[in-house]
């Protein structure tokens, strides 16, 4: 494949490596928390939720700052610093003598941010507008591919102990930084840089465009509730299968890889044809209906094959987010699309704070009472509420106005 600028394949490779590094550590996180905290899996679940929340909180406040710094000092420098900080984070977790070190590492990672924002900026800097969609698609595919490979590799490395995948993730992060240092040129030319402005770096200000989306309150409420429900996967999966099915790190890794593959296939092959046939409104309702059913069935699954069947069926839930975003994008003009997407990213950050706390508490509460599926029941309930909000506040309201 031909690229218009040498920085583009480097940015895509960086996204792939970074995503692999993130996925590697997931299968062994429960075992490491149990080891350091000397707690059972139910309490480890709660601690895992706190770790995810501290990352989300620091990332929420630091994300706009990192973006503004990349506009001031360039993409390459910010990418290098971010990746080095991620390497330090994983090293903290690999050699942590206590839980406090894990929390310090997660805070560092949240402040540093991830590579996705700067990598997107690299593509926007050097790619013609008519080709950006394809390049952004490749970037998303690299992220999805890394999330398939990472957990599988992490599950295999878990046989060496719960710290081995963190060592591998740290090595990948530093190798990623070395790759950028060696071969990636700066893409933001000096004349396009702007002074750092704290007003632009205000995370609360990112929500302002959401209040100018033409009567989209029900859509925004639905988007937030859906994102909180969907956080049941990253925040509880590894703990849930450890408690409910007593899976080891290898089995956890393969299941996460299967989940990533299922979602990626849905993004590539399912969303476009479904929206074309049914329209955005009905596509959202189809995805939410699948969420209500699949999440509820997860709560009562007792065999591994049942979980894999639900992973395949759960790909339909991937219809919800893109369809809601497509509807929202029609509520603002072209000049405000970027601001809208920034506001939606901030909404996702709120879900990333609230979701893990709610889901891990629900799982732990149920596990202590003999039923580990509490988090999935909560997710199913949230999907049902989102369905009602969307049906009454969007679909029927549009029919009345028509």
Annotate each PLM feature.
Residues 62-74, 266-280, 363:
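Helix-to-loop junctions at the C-terminal end of transmembrane segments
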Residues 42, 158-171, 361-383:
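A membrane-interface helix-boundary motif in multi-pass transporters
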Residues 60-97:
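Conserved MFS/SLC helix-loop-helix module at the cytosolic interface between two early adjacent transmembrane helices
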Residues 1-4, 185-222:
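Juxtamembrane intracellular "pre-TM" segments in multi-pass secondary transporters
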Residues 177-183, 377-402:
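Multi-pass alpha-helical transporter architecture, strongest
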Residues 281-324:
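C-terminal transmembrane helical hairpin of 12-TM major facilitator-type secondary transporters
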Residues 105-144:
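Cytoplasmic helix-loop-helix junction between adjacent transmembrane helices
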Residues 28-45, 235-251:
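Short amphipathic helix-loop junctions that connect adjacent transmembrane helices
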């Amino acid at each position: 494949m031909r690229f218009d600028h040498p920085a583009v394949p480097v940015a895509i490779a960086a996204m792939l490596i970074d995503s692999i590094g993130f996925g590697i550590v997931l299968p062994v996180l429960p075992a490491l928390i149990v080891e350091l905290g000397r707690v059972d899996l139910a309490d480890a679940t709660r601690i895992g939720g706190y770790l995810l929340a501290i990352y989300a909180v620091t990332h929420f406040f630091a994300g706009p700052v990192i973006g503004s710094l990349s506009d001031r000092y360039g993409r390459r420098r910010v990418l290098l610093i971010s990746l080095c900080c991620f390497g330090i984070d994983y090293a903290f977790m690999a050699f942590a003598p206590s839980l406090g070190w894990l929390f310090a590492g997660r805070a560092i990672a949240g402040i540093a941010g991830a590579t996705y924002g700067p990598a997107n900026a690299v593509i926007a800097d050097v790619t013609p507008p008519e080709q950006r969609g394809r390049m952004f698609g490749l970037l998303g595919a690299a992220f999805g591919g890394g999330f398939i490979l990472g957990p599988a590799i992490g599950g295999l490395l878990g046989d060496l102990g719960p710290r081995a995948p963190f060592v591998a993730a740290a090595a990948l992060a530093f190798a990623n930084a070395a790759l950028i240092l060696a071969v990636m040129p700066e893409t933001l030319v000096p004349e396009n840089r702007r002074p750092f402005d704290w007003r632009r770096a205000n995370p609360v200000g990112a929500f302002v465009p959401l209040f100018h989306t033409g009567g989209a309150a029900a859509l925004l409420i639905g988007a937030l509730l859906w994102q909180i429900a969907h956080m049941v996967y990253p925040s509880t999966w590894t703990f849930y299968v450890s408690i409910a099915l007593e899976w080891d790190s290898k089995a956890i890794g393969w299941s996460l890889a299967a989940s990533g593959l299922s979602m990626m296939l849905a993004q590539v092959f399912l969303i476009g044809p479904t929206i074309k046939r049914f329209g955005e409104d009905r596509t959202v309702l189809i995805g939410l209906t699948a969420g209500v059913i699949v999440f509820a069935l997860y709560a009562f699954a007792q065999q591994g094959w049942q979980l894999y069947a639900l992973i395949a069926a759960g790909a339909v839930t991937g219809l919800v987010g893109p369809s809601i975003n497509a509807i929202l994008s029609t509520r603002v003009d072209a000049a405000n699309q970027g601001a809208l997407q920034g506001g939606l990213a901030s909404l996702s950050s709120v879900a990333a704070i609230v979701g893990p706390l709610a889901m891990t508490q629900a799982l732990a509460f149920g596990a202590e009472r003999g039923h580990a599926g509490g988090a999935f029941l909560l997710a199913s309930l949230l999907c049902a509420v989102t369905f009602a909000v969307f049906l009454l506040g969007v679909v029927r309201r549009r029919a009345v106005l028509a």
